[in-house]
Every structure is written in C-alpha cells, then in structure tokens.
Amino acid sequence: MARRIYRFIWNRRLSSWQLQQGLYAIGQATVARYGADELVVAIDPVNFEKPYPHDLEGVSTVHKSCPPDRKGKARLARGYPALTACVVNLPEPVVTYAQWFSYTREFLSENVELMQAITTTRQLYPEHPLCFVADSG
C-alpha cells in the first residue's frame, strides 16, 4: 500500500489530510470485514534516520540503536522521530495513527503525540473496546 501512497505525495491537488482520511477509511473497512470484538492497538515510537539531511526542513537529532556504531552501542543520527499506532490482532494490520514530527519550536512533546494517537484511534473505532499496548523502550 505504501507504493500506492508515495505517488500522491507531490500531488498539489491532494493534501496529507485527504491521504490520512483514505488510510483511515481503509482501516475501518478492514476492521468491519473481520468483525473483531476487541482491538489491540500497538503504539510504537520510532526514529527514522535520513542519510543526507542537509537540505531537509526540521531535521532533528534522533537516537538510533540499529545499526549500532563500531562499538556496538546506540548512536545519535540526523532524522525524524515518528509515532505509529496499529491494530495488531487481525489477520492484516490496520494503521490508526502515523505521524512524523520534528523537535522545532512548534513541537509540544512526544506525550502530546501519544495522546493524539489514542484520541484518533478512539474516534475511528468508538464502538470497539480498545486495548493499547507499547514496549518499554
């Protein structure tokens, strides 16, 4: 599905909001098709490294453990933090939230992003009991 979305990124007639709404509609149709009683939603903060970030807007310093440095330790790299929420108890995953962000002046906190992921997921699936899970990392 990502390949289909990439061709729309530079299309000025299609906004990121419209892409997200389409992604959410696909997710809602998938959940309805499987008829799950409860949804288990994994919330995953990740860091994306950009190899040549010199001209990119809002690039941040992120903590990367994969691949490690020469000593096998985590390292600092240039890139973007992101947060995803995904239904994981169906035969196919369903994205309920996906957001890249940057540590700029406008950025409030990662906790605000976490709350937005939970709020968005609750708005998309108000009739389903939700169980949110995350790792301790």
Residue ranges and their predicted role:
Residues 54, 92-137:
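Single, function-defining residue in the core of a domain
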Residues 8-10, 15-19, 100-110:
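Short flexible/disordered coil segments
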Residues 1-7:
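Short, basic interhelical loop/turn and adjoining N-cap
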Residues 9-93:
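Active-site-proximal, Lys/Arg-enriched surface segment
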Residues 7-9, 35, 81, 98, ...:
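Compositionally biased, intrinsically disordered low-complexity regions enriched in proline and serine
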